[in-house]
């Protein structure tokens, strides 16, 4: 059925480079009145906690207490889908939520409950400084606590904590916080992208047929027969439940249409009912149906498990056949296709996730993490893959300007000028999207993980900057954060804490004992080896706990190798099975090493003992040295100075070497990343003063960026020098990605000259083989104004790290960190 729609008001022809010029006011970002109203409705809703999923999953686990683990998980998923309340919102064109109302967070007791009980009883969610959530009434508050009590001692978190050794916990988030592995304590299978193209080609019926065939082929001679039988049986239960869930929506939409008096809305509801009827088991026949199937497939992953960063893959590629067919058949216009895209973008913001207060104090955000959408790049043959949908999806991001999706544009030497111009115009609009990825080093990095050239060319982005092969790789990205300045603390102080003196790691020397700078570098290597051993062994324990307690048969259905092998994603069923922790604070370490090398060993102006005492004293009483270390008289990373840049390269390569190649329980290898997202702020709160001129509690350096302390920014030579420093390392060694934030004020990129300067800068950046870059087009003055009058800047998006967020919802320490980042000019 074709639905008639009014043309978007004020849009220009689609052959123009950009059609954003019509807008004037914030409330009119989109040319589609429907989209603006849906966007505003989202902003006006409160962040609630919803009890229904907790109630239904607990009910199922109690009923099937003695069932095999995979079947117990499957029956819980089924119970949710058959009984959860359904929601259709006014003017919505895409159906499906995450077993909770829009903007309300479900509860996932399978992973952890102790913090939920504790916060409800002692520090209510609604009283947090940021990321507040609200429980609707005292009855539900009491019910949540009572239901969570059932799960005490039975969660993934409980199992992990029972297995960690004291040497591992010394360095973890419950100890000195040298590394933080807690994401997968409370989160499920995430940081992944499924094979949407496969689902679109065969539908749920096809997936069920594949699972049934796998079940029938099993041999009782297979020593894993029982596990594989349970896997296929659980998968079939969950896929059948998905069909019934979508059919429930079809029925609700039809019933709503019968009651609707507005002819236009009645027709929309009837079409949505037909869409759901078609895709409940079959394949989509239209672009609208393909989008609808996409939304159901994704939200069902978020119902099964609460994994961060369920990403959308190369959406302009796998969705294009349905768009092209509708355009050829004249059953859709570009205007209506864009409206559907924008409605879907708004809907992507509905899922929210309750997190513990410790996490949100340092890593703001109430969403499911990095739900990235990848556009552009090359195809499997190496040719440019840009199409009309690439342009529409990028434009839709500019019209909606919300936290999700996290739009990524892949760039290469033959990226069309039209796409580059549209990308630059989006960046100049100042809402923090898109982020850019360089195909050459990214593809090289994927091949380092063992992928073929054709596979590597098909990479997508998951989460912030993590590189992934959709439907083939379960990379366990974002597995841990490594606070490298805390490791440096062990280097300068003999493996002891600067604040307590406790011996935490091996004594590999200290600043008052080293006789040469080579001894310092050797100590860095030894400390990195020791602490990465502790972290990686901890991550293997966590990985095994997920395999034992929380298999994911539904999401496994979208991985062909899981279907063939009869192994769940958590058991190593994917083709590529990594674990990927990332390092934070590299520039803090590099500048610390440069300071030691210059002032202690080369110029001999200060002794190692004097430097050590300065950081023990938090620089108090050492003001002259503090000023010197933060001045241009000391060599710093970010200024195209090999003296300091070579030490950044040393740190980068040291970390990558100690992570790469380690084996995972799922038969894959560890993969290093170098980025902090916004965790550098929280890490700084737990890090003593450092030799680079950073005082205690200040943020460590962010991502691949230079140092910014209260004593001053260490990069002083402009953007070109910064890029030259950044590209002296081989980014492909960081096979889990690198991240670079850059900030320009609006006037630096204004007008044709500003646009062309930014475009030329990006071209140069790509040519020099940097892997990633993202921009904040925001002045310090604007951010300070938002701090003073947050009510006037409620929907002001800023680029934080791999994601954008509403500035006024960020914690004060993170706001300060954003303001302190160097304001660059061409």
UniProtKB/Swiss-Prot annotation:
Keywords in alphabetical order: Lyase, Organic radical
Keyword Lyase: yes
Catalyzed reactions per annotation: (2S)-3-sulfopropanediol = 3-oxopropane-1-sulfonate + H2O
Gene Ontology terms, MF aspect: lyase activity
Residues at the active site: 464, 466
Top enzyme category: lyase
Post-translational modification: Requires the activating protein HpfH to generate the key active site glycyl radical on Gly-802 that is involved in catalysis.
Domain PFL: 33-695
Keyword hit for Lyase: yes
Disulfide bridge positions per record: none
Family membership noted in the UniProt record: Belongs to the glycyl radical enzyme (GRE) family.
Protein name: (2S)-3-sulfopropanediol dehydratase
Source organism of the structure: Klebsiella oxytoca
Name of the gene encoding the protein in the UniProt record: hpfG
């Amino acid at each position: 059925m074709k639905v008639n729609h009014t043309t978007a008001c004020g849009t220009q022809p689609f052959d123009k480079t950009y059609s954003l010029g019509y807008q004037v006011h914030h409330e009119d970002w989109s040319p589609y009145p429907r989209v603006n109203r849906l966007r505003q409705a989202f902003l006006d809703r409160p962040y609630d906690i919803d009890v229904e999923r907790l109630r239904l999953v607990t009910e199922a686990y109690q009923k099937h207490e003695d069932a095999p683990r995979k079947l117990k998980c499957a029956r819980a998923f089924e119970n949710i889908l058959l009984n959860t309340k359904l929601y259709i919102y006014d003017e919505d064109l895409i159906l499906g939520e995450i077993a909770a109302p829009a903007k309300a967070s479900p509860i996932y007791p399978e992973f952890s409950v102790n913090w939920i009980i504790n916060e409800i009883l002692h520090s209510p969610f609604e009283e947090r400084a940021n990321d507040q959530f609200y429980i609707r009434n005292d009855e539900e508050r009491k019910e949540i606590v009572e239901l969570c009590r059932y799960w005490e001692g039975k969660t993934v978190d409980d199992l992990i904590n029972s297995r960690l050794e004291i040497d591992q916990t010394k360095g973890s988030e419950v100890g000195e916080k040298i590394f933080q592995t807690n994401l997968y304590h409370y989160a499920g299978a995430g940081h992944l992208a499924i094979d949407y193209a496969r689902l679109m080609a065969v539908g749920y019926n096809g997936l069920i047929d594949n699972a049934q065939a796998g079940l029938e082929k099993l041999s009782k001679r297979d020593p894993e027969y029982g596990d594989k039988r349970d896997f296929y049986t659980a998968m079939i239960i969950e896929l059948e439940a998905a069909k019934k869930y979508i059919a429930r929506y079809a029925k609700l939409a039809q019933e709503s249409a019968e009651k609707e008096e507005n002819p236009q809305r009645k027709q929309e509801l009837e079409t949505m009912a037909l869409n759901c009827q078609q895709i409940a088991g079959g394949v989509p026949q239209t672009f609208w149906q393909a989008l609808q199937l996409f939304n159901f497939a994704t939200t069902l992953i978020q119902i099964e498990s609460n994994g961060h960063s369920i990403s959308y893959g190369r959406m302009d590629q796998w969705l294009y056949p349905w768009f092209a067919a509708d355009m050829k058949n004249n059953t859709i216009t570009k205007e209506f296709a864009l409206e559907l895209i924008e409605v879907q973008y708004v809907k992507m913001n509905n899922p929210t996730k309750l997190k513990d207060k410790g996490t949100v104090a340092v890593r703001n955000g109430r969403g499911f993490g990095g739900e990235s959408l990848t556009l552009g790049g090359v195809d499997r043959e190496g040719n440019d893959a840009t199409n009309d949908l690439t342009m529409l999806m990028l434009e839709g991001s500019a019209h909606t300007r919300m936290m999700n999706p996290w739009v990524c544009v892949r760039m290469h030497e033959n990226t069309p000028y039209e796409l580059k111009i549209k990308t630059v115009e989006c960046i100049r609009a100042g809402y923090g999207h898109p982020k850019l990825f360089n195909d050459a080093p990214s593809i090289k990095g994927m091949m380092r993980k063992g992928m073929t050239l054709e596979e590597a060319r098909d990479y997508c982005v998951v989460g912030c900057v993590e590189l992934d092969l959709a439907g083939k790789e379960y990379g366990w990205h974002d597995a841990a954060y490594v606070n490298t300045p805390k490791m440096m603390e062990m280097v300068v102080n003999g493996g002891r804490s600067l604040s307590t003196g406790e011996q935490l790691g091996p004594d590999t020397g200290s600043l008052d004992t080293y006789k040469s700078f080579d001894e310092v570098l050797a100590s860095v290597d030894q400390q990195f080896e020791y602490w990465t051993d502790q972290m990686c062994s901890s991550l293997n324990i966590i990985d095994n706990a997920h395999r034992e307690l929380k298999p994911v048969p539904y999401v496994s259905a979208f991985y062909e190798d899981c279907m063939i092998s009869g192994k769940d994603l958590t058991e190593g069923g994917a083709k590529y099975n990594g674990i990927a922790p990332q390092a934070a604070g590299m520039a803090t370490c590099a500048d610390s090493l440069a300071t030691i090398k210059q002032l202690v060993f080369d110029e001999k102006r200060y002794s190692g003992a004097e430097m050590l005492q300065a950081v023990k004293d938090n620089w108090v009483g050492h003001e002259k040295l503090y000023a010197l270390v933060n001045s241009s008289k000391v060599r710093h990373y970010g200024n195209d100075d090999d003296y300091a840049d070579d030490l950044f390269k040393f740190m980068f390569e040291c970390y990558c070497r100690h992570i790469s190649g380690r084996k995972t329980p799922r038969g894959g290898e560890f993969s290093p990343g170098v980025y902090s997202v916004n965790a550098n702020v929280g890490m700084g709160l737990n890090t003593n003063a450092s030799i680079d001129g950073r005082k205690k509690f200040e943020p460590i350096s962010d991502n691949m960026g230079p140092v910014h302390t209260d004593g001053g920014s260490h990069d002083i030579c402009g953007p070109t020098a910064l890029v030259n420093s950044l590209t002296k390392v081989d980014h492909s060694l960081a096979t889990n990605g690198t991240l670079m934030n850059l900030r320009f004020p609006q006037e630096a990129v204004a007008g044709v000259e500003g646009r062309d300067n930014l475009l030329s800068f990006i071209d140069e950046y790509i040519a020099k083989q940097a892997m990633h870059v993202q921009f904040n087009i925001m002045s310090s003055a604007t951010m300070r104004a938002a701090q003073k009058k947050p009510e006037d800047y409620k929907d002001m998006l800023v680029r934080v790290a791999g994601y954008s967020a509403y500035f006024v919802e960020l914690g004060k320490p993170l706001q300060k960190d954003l303001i302190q980042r160097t304001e660059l000019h061409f």
